[in-house]
């Protein structure tokens, strides 16, 4: 959508059977409804994976976000009960170029369209997603809304709503920067994942307290595969409650929202570090470690979201293809060890261990003097490549060494 010479919004043609996407900067895309009819607003972002759409939809880190798939053809393999990463769909809305009219996969239990409809997820299809993504890369992610069905009608007059009316709804949506969302997606009660695979039925090698800030289901499973008993605990847990679990290590998960607004979790993490527990953080957990150490965080222009992001391990020189979902990053110096800024270097030396090769964004932190490290990306690989699975082994090794030395 463009503006005319007078500066007013140029209104595209649409009717009550269409679905309309409105961006906060005034751009409008008219397509077809996909999934449920209605209205949804949130931060519009794009994901670059060719596969793994079911894992994307159920990732709690996408809370309050409208997701655009850059790959044009989505839905071929349908949906099943094995691939979700949580108990529900978390995206606020979903946009695809060309949804598959047929499902063709031996594991499929239904269609993506039906699943979105059943779960009340408002979506849109048959727009130029390439044009949309190019705009988001240029202008940055922003607030947006999808409107279809009765949401396009002014209930007072019975007429179609104007773009100005829809735009007002979009601009009344909270900005992602400044939002605290992890309590919204966290489990309310502790649950436990026992060792599995070759360790099934055996005594656990290690006990992990995993703080759920929006955890994906595959993450504790990756630890359980390595002989860990994983207590997944609510974000509201206290340090005393963590200690009562007698963990060998503590894990902070991925999650949505602005890390600057996670003050209680940052203080909890500092208590964990002060007590000498081995610590591993992923995604939001990486950002919280950064802030606990005294570094800042900032919002990326359009973020990293997809299962094909190149990351370089600066300690080995190896490049990994990794899965990402983050719109914020840690502001830390690259290429040297520095004193962690918090309380004049209380936590000793730290260095950036990984960077994204597309934009040099910090993708990992390694503490030198305390048993703590984190990565910004997703080594659990759900969906995505398994290049970074070694990080779970590193966490186990950290717990093993810490046990020998005595915490």
Curated annotation (Swiss-Prot):
<feature type="binding site">
    <location>
        <position position="284"/>
    </location>
    <ligand>
        <name>L-glutamine</name>
    </ligand>
</feature>
<feature type="binding site">
    <location>
        <position position="257"/>
    </location>
    <ligand>
        <name>L-glutamine</name>
    </ligand>
</feature>
<comment type="similarity">
    <text>Belongs to the CarA family.</text>
</comment>
<feature type="binding site">
    <location>
        <position position="61"/>
    </location>
    <ligand>
        <name>L-glutamine</name>
    </ligand>
</feature>
<feature type="active site" description="Nucleophile">
    <location>
        <position position="283"/>
    </location>
</feature>
<comment type="pathway">
    <text>Pyrimidine metabolism; UMP biosynthesis via de novo pathway; (S)-dihydroorotate from bicarbonate: step 1/3.</text>
</comment>
<feature type="binding site">
    <location>
        <position position="328"/>
    </location>
    <ligand>
        <name>L-glutamine</name>
    </ligand>
</feature>
<keyword id="KW-0315">Glutamine amidotransferase</keyword>
<keyword id="KW-0067">ATP-binding</keyword>
<feature type="binding site">
    <location>
        <position position="287"/>
    </location>
    <ligand>
        <name>L-glutamine</name>
    </ligand>
</feature>
<dbReference type="InterPro" id="IPR006274">
    <property type="entry name" value="CarbamoylP_synth_ssu"/>
</dbReference>
<dbReference type="GO" id="GO:0004088">
    <property type="term" value="F:carbamoyl-phosphate synthase (glutamine-hydrolyzing) activity"/>
</dbReference>
<dbReference type="Pfam" id="PF00117">
    <property type="entry name" value="GATase"/>
</dbReference>
<comment type="subunit">
    <text>Composed of two chains; the small (or glutamine) chain promotes the hydrolysis of glutamine to ammonia, which is used by the large (or ammonia) chain to synthesize carbamoyl phosphate. Tetramer of heterodimers (alpha,beta)4.</text>
</comment>
<feature type="domain" description="Glutamine amidotransferase type-1">
    <location>
        <begin position="207"/>
        <end position="405"/>
    </location>
</feature>
<feature type="binding site">
    <location>
        <position position="255"/>
    </location>
    <ligand>
        <name>L-glutamine</name>
    </ligand>
</feature>
<dbReference type="InterPro" id="IPR035686">
    <property type="entry name" value="CPSase_GATase1"/>
</dbReference>
<dbReference type="InterPro" id="IPR050472">
    <property type="entry name" value="Anth_synth/Amidotransfase"/>
</dbReference>
<dbReference type="InterPro" id="IPR002474">
    <property type="entry name" value="CarbamoylP_synth_ssu_N"/>
</dbReference>
<feature type="binding site">
    <location>
        <position position="327"/>
    </location>
    <ligand>
        <name>L-glutamine</name>
    </ligand>
</feature>
<dbReference type="GO" id="GO:0006526">
    <property type="term" value="P:L-arginine biosynthetic process"/>
</dbReference>
<dbReference type="GO" id="GO:0006207">
    <property type="term" value="P:'de novo' pyrimidine nucleobase biosynthetic process"/>
</dbReference>
<dbReference type="InterPro" id="IPR017926">
    <property type="entry name" value="GATASE"/>
</dbReference>
<feature type="active site">
    <location>
        <position position="378"/>
    </location>
</feature>
<dbReference type="GO" id="GO:0006541">
    <property type="term" value="P:glutamine metabolic process"/>
</dbReference>
<keyword id="KW-0028">Amino-acid biosynthesis</keyword>
<protein>
    <recommendedName>
        <fullName>Carbamoyl phosphate synthase small chain</fullName>
        <ecNumber>6.3.5.5</ecNumber>
    </recommendedName>
</protein>
<dbReference type="GO" id="GO:0004359">
    <property type="term" value="F:glutaminase activity"/>
</dbReference>
<dbReference type="InterPro" id="IPR036480">
    <property type="entry name" value="CarbP_synth_ssu_N_sf"/>
</dbReference>
<comment type="pathway">
    <text>Amino-acid biosynthesis; L-arginine biosynthesis; carbamoyl phosphate from bicarbonate: step 1/1.</text>
</comment>
<feature type="active site">
    <location>
        <position position="380"/>
    </location>
</feature>
<comment type="function">
    <text>Small subunit of the glutamine-dependent carbamoyl phosphate synthetase (CPSase). CPSase catalyzes the formation of carbamoyl phosphate from the ammonia moiety of glutamine, carbonate, and phosphate donated by ATP, constituting the first step of 2 biosynthetic pathways, one leading to arginine and/or urea and the other to pyrimidine nucleotides. The small subunit (glutamine amidotransferase) binds and cleaves glutamine to supply the large subunit with the substrate ammonia.</text>
</comment>
<keyword id="KW-0665">Pyrimidine biosynthesis</keyword>
<feature type="binding site">
    <location>
        <position position="325"/>
    </location>
    <ligand>
        <name>L-glutamine</name>
    </ligand>
</feature>
<keyword id="KW-0055">Arginine biosynthesis</keyword>
<feature type="region of interest" description="CPSase">
    <location>
        <begin position="1"/>
        <end position="203"/>
    </location>
</feature>
<keyword id="KW-0436">Ligase</keyword>
<keyword id="KW-0547">Nucleotide-binding</keyword>
<dbReference type="InterPro" id="IPR029062">
    <property type="entry name" value="Class_I_gatase-like"/>
</dbReference>
<dbReference type="Pfam" id="PF00988">
    <property type="entry name" value="CPSase_sm_chain"/>
</dbReference>
<dbReference type="GO" id="GO:0005524">
    <property type="term" value="F:ATP binding"/>
</dbReference>
<dbReference type="GO" id="GO:0044205">
    <property type="term" value="P:'de novo' UMP biosynthetic process"/>
</dbReference>
